[in-house]
Amino acid sequence: MVKRISILGSTGSIGTQTLDIVTHHPDAFQVVGLAAGGNVALLAQQVAEFRPEIVAIRQAEKLEDLKAAVAELTDYQPMYVVGEEGVVEVARYGDAESVVTGIVGCAGLLPTMAAIAAGKDIALANKETLIAGAPVVLPLVEKMGVKLLPADSEHSAIFQCLQGVPEGGLRRIILTASGGAFRDLPVERLPFVTVQDALKHPNWSMGQKITIDSATLMNKGLEVIEAHYLFGLDYDHIDIVIHPQSIIHSLIEVQDTSVLAQLGWPDMRLPLLYALSWPERIYTDWEPLDLVKAGSLSFREPDHDKYPCMQLAYGAGRAGGAMPAVLNAANEQAVALFLQEKISFLDIPRLIEKTCDLYVGQNTASPDLETILAADQWARRTVLENSACVATRP
């Protein structure tokens, strides 16, 4: 039976890899909705190839360019919607059974909530939705009775390992991290690294923001918070280990101390496919893992001096309330400034820490959506206000 899906962030890394899955499995999936930011050329190609029923382009001023780019499709005309509201329309579009949330950052929160409220199952590739919005997202998931399935490699690995583990059987989660672009760089050299240096990920092909998050290890810190919300373990039972080969995507320890792991080549398509096909397993012709070719697998403790963002994430997670939303927004804004070469690499954790410290007195244990969104905006403003004052010298 063909599953009808919509993709939020179709021109990004997650979106294009999801569409690659659809291309190889047309008997399993049909695209009914696409939402993208402003990449007209790529979105036009996707519209022509997959012929969705509804298409959103967030940058409304580019709608006419998009229509012109697909003008030769005289036998087909989708419904066009624009702006943030248009993305929400795609998220809740009636004919889709599942929605892949590939929008980067907290911008994915409201569309994901709209999809959940419309009764759609979620293939969650946007971790910020849970990190910032868990206090409102999780009750909505329970109310609507939808499935919230992890589509990133680490949480998919945990989810796969948990199949068959009885309730209460999970003892510890071990998240693996590649270590990012600077895993082998002496910490003394970090003040001198450039944007180009930070974007050279050793293992994965990802978007710019998540690649920087990998270099700071904030990506793993955010995944700790996401794992807490998805799987219900407290932070003392969620660990991070550096695994340079990125073959083991994460592990779980069960009550008898047995450890289960999910292995595979670094390929985001596998967790995406599993989130869309669960509980089934769909045959693929992708290159299977060859353990001899993979060679030795190594592990080491993260360097806390090199990766201060990791502990900032643990601290925000333990604080709870709207603090994870503040952490996430501060990180998004700081990373954006770094990518614009307005701050140094080491200014990223400095700005995040200062912002979180300033929010402590405002935090509330059970924030509503309005409070979460206000905290997000406050954190972004605070980072911008303090960015001119950070110590950028080596």
Swiss-Prot record:
Pathway(s) it belongs to: Isoprenoid biosynthesis; isopentenyl diphosphate biosynthesis via DXP pathway; isopentenyl diphosphate from 1-deoxy-D-xylulose 5-phosphate: step 1/6
InterPro entries xref list: DXP_reductoisomerase, DXP_reductoisomerase_C, DXP_reductoisomerase_N, DXPR_C, DXPR_C_sf, NAD(P)-bd_dom_sf
Needed co-factor(s): Mg(2+); Mn(2+)
GO molecular function term, any single one: NADPH binding
Binding site for 1-deoxy-D-xylulose 5-phosphate: 127, 153-154, 178, 201, 214, 219-220, 223
Pfam family, one: DXP_redisom_C
Reactions that this protein is recorded to catalyse: 2-C-methyl-D-erythritol 4-phosphate + NADP(+) = 1-deoxy-D-xylulose 5-phosphate + NADPH + H(+)
Residues that span the membrane, as ranges: none
SUPFAM superfamilies cross-referenced by the UniProt entry: 1-deoxy-D-xylulose-5-phosphate reductoisomerase, C-terminal domain (SSF69055), Glyceraldehyde-3-phosphate dehydrogenase-like, C-terminal domain (SSF55347), NAD(P)-binding Rossmann-fold domains (SSF51735)
Binding site for NADPH: 11-14, 37, 39, 126, 128, 207
Keywords: Isoprene biosynthesis, Manganese, Metal-binding, NADP, Oxidoreductase
The keyword 4Fe-4S is annotated on this UniProt entry: no
GO biological process: isopentenyl diphosphate biosynthetic process, methylerythritol 4-phosphate pathway involved in terpenoid biosynthetic process
UniProt enzyme class: oxidoreductase
HAMAP family: DXP_reductoisom
Family of this protein: Belongs to the DXR family.
Function: Catalyzes the NADPH-dependent rearrangement and reduction of 1-deoxy-D-xylulose-5-phosphate (DXP) to 2-C-methyl-D-erythritol 4-phosphate (MEP).
NCBIfam families in alphabetical order: Dxr, PRK12464.1
Protein name: 1-deoxy-D-xylulose 5-phosphate reductoisomerase
Organism: Synechocystis sp. (strain ATCC 27184 / PCC 6803 / Kazusa)
